[in-house]
């Protein structure tokens, strides 16, 4: 009698996330990805429960929610402070300036800050990676190995959005060769998000709840979004004019521009204030 081989549950989880990632970034229109994030998170959570994982295994046990809330609020404060410091330092400020948020209206920005970032991105991704995927890997592996694998997969999760949104971040101007700059951006983003994934996993295991990493994740993305929006808007402001009065041309033909100042067409548009396209991804933003 032959032994029937079963597919490891973690392989199912990885396959579902890979298909989801390709569908979001290569097939579906942009507004659909937020809803699909939540659907996939709910679906994989249901799959894990059906496979025998308890709410505590998945970090969704309500008995640990208050502990996760306390740990998450502390981590969120530290994370937001780190983002604010990075946006304030001249050496790292260009990485936060994203021209896609320049023309985003207040209504759309409010949607990103109230729904898209904290719920459809941070909460959904924490349920997927630090909830379901971490539990699936921990069934047959040590916690350290499970954290390593899920963190690397979290870094890979951000490869496609980094490629798609590379043109939106002025940091690309720091590298002359566009293809080399894109590769460096992918490597840097994958490494940084993998590191963040390890930190989120530590919070999840320490607090026994996905609430803690979800709050820290949301704090990073929301503060980065706000910083990018502020930097782009400040960078795109028109410099103030002097109130000394216009200079007349010798023939009396009207005001003449001052030397060194723009002519009637007005000042050139700032490099950091290009057209925005909604949610951010490769730089500071909800992806």
Predicted regions and their residues:
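Hydrophobic alpha-helical segments of integral membrane proteins
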Residues: 45, 76-80, 155, 201
């Amino acid at each position: 009698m032959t032994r029937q081989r079963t597919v490891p549950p973690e392989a199912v989880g990885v396959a579902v996330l890979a298909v989801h990632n390709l569908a979001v970034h290569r097939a579906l229109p942009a507004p659909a990805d937020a809803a699909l994030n939540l659907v996939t998170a709910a679906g994989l959570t249901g799959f894990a429960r059906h496979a025998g994982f308890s709410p505590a295994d998945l970090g969704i046990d309500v008995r640990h929610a208050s502990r996760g809330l306390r740990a998450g609020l502390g981590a969120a404060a530290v994370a937001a402070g780190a983002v604010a410091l990075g946006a304030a330092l001249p050496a790292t400020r260009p990485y936060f300036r994203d021209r896609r948020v320049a023309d985003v209206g207040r209504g759309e920005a409010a949607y990103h800050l109230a729904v898209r970032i904290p719920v459809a991105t941070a909460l959904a991704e924490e349920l997927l990676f630090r909830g379901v995927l971490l539990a699936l890997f921990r069934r047959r592996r040590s916690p350290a190995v499970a954290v390593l694998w899920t963190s690397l997969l979290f870094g890979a999760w951000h490869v496609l959005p980094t490629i798609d949104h590379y043109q939106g971040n002025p940091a690309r101007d720091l590298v002359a060769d566009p293809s080399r700059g894109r590769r460096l951006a992918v490597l840097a983003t994958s490494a940084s998000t993998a590191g963040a994934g390890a930190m989120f996993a530590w919070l999840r295991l320490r607090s026994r709840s996905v609430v803690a990493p979800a709050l820290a994740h949301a704090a990073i993305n929301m503060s980065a979004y706000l910083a990018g929006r502020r930097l782009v808007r400040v960078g795109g402001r028109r410099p103030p004019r002097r109130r000394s009065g216009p200079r007349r041309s010798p023939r009396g033909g009207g005001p003449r521009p001052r030397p060194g100042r723009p002519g009637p067409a007005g000042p050139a548009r700032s490099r950091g204030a290009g057209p925005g396209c909604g949610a951010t991804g490769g730089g500071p933003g909800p992806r």
